[in-house]
């Protein structure tokens, strides 16, 4: 789970979850749609990934019972510094 302090909370912004990137699950090797923190939906391992880079390969980490790795965006980062166009 991503962590923050009371001092760094001011840098986080809650947004609507209706965008597809919040609901989508991504496979190893897929292109990262948005920079941010991603969480494996099976084991909870978290990674940081840059937009347009590939997600880590299947051998990045293993699951028991051969469950597939699926990444979910949990924190999107504002790499443009424009607050995602939100005023």
Curated annotation (Swiss-Prot):
Species this protein is from: Escherichia coli
Q: What else is known?
A: Plasmid Clo DF13 originates from Enterobacter cloacae but is stably maintained in and studied mostly from E.coli.
Entry keyword set = Plasmid
The major lineage groups are:
Bacteria, Pseudomonadati, Pseudomonadota, Gammaproteobacteria, Enterobacterales
Role noted for this protein: This protein inhibits the multiplication of double-stranded DNA phages, such as P1 and lambda.
As recorded in Swiss-Prot or TrEMBL, the protein's gene is named: L
Q: What name appears for this protein in its UniProt entry?
A: Protein L
UniProt superkingdom: Bacteria
